[in-house]
């Protein structure tokens, strides 16, 4: 797959993201405009929940999904707070919920808390796309990444996602490989999302090719594969413009 072909495909698989405390309604409106490119729209925008109404207005009839985050970024909020976050987001019009797995509890062996969290996500997000953020850079070990992936997949997660982008280590090729192989081996009807530190067409292309090699080319749709990034879109557009 040449870079231009990859860039065009990746636009439609992108969750164009801005999750910064300095975000404003104006900056989110601009993000929504950027998501609608001459080469097609991004799959989604991923924004803080307080800007969902702005995004709904800007993206009306575009087909672009609105994603937001809960239990973000530390993954250690009380379940009652997470439930309220979900309720607020869905009432505002979110289509997709990216929820941070309680990875600190997971590392401490508190698997019952993790199970309760996953049950809450499944129960509260019926009919919506859920993405469980494992924070693989903090899990570190392959065995932990696989175990956390399995917990999320067995709970019915729509996607398993690498990272919040707020820790020292974000998405890695190695973690993506483990997660994709876990989906394939268990024949789970769940997708994969890489996020955090993916800035260039070449960065994103390697995840696309990895997923293709493990899951097959037919699997590479927005229903199964996403990349979350903020600055990647500019590089994808530049790649297309340059023609190589």
Language-model features: locations:
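Terminal helix/beta-alpha structural elements that buttress the NAD(P)+-binding lobe
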Residues: 195
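N-terminal beta-loop-helix "entrance" segment that forms/cooperates
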Residues: 235
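Alpha/beta enzyme core
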Residues: 2-40, 50-192, 201-230, 238-244
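Short donor-sugar binding/catalytic loops of nucleotide-sugar-dependent glycosyltransferases
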Residues: 198
């Amino acid at each position: 797959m040449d870079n231009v072909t990859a860039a065009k495909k990746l636009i439609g698989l992108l969750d164009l993201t801005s999750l910064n405390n300095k975000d404003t309604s104006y900056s989110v409106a601009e993000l929504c405009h950027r998501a609608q490119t001459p080469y097609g729209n991004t799959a989604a925008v991923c924004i803080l929940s307080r800007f969902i109404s702005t995004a709904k207005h800007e993206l009306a009839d575009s087909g672009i999904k609105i994603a937001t985050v809960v239990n973000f970024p530390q993954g250690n909020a009380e379940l009652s707070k997470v439930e309220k976050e979900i309720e607020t987001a869905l009432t505002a019009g979110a289509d997709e919920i990216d929820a941070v797995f309680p990875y600190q509890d997971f590392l401490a062996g508190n698997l019952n808390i993790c199970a309760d969290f996953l049950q809450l996500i499944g129960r509260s997000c019926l009919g919506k796309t859920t993405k469980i953020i494992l924070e693989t850079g903090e899990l570190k070990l392959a065995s932990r990444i696989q175990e956390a992936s399995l917990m999320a997949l067995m709970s019915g997660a729509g996607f398993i996602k690498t990272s919040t982008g707020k820790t020292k280590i974000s998405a890695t090729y190695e973690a993506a490989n483990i997660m994709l192989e876990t989906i394939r081996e268990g024949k789970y009807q769940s997708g994969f999302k890489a996020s955090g530190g993916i800035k260039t067409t070449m960065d994103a292309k390697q995840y696309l090719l990895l997923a293709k090699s493990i899951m097959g080319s037919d699997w590479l749709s927005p229903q199964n594969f996403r990349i979350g990034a903020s600055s990647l879109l500019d590089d994808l557009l530049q790649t297309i413009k340059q023609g190589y």
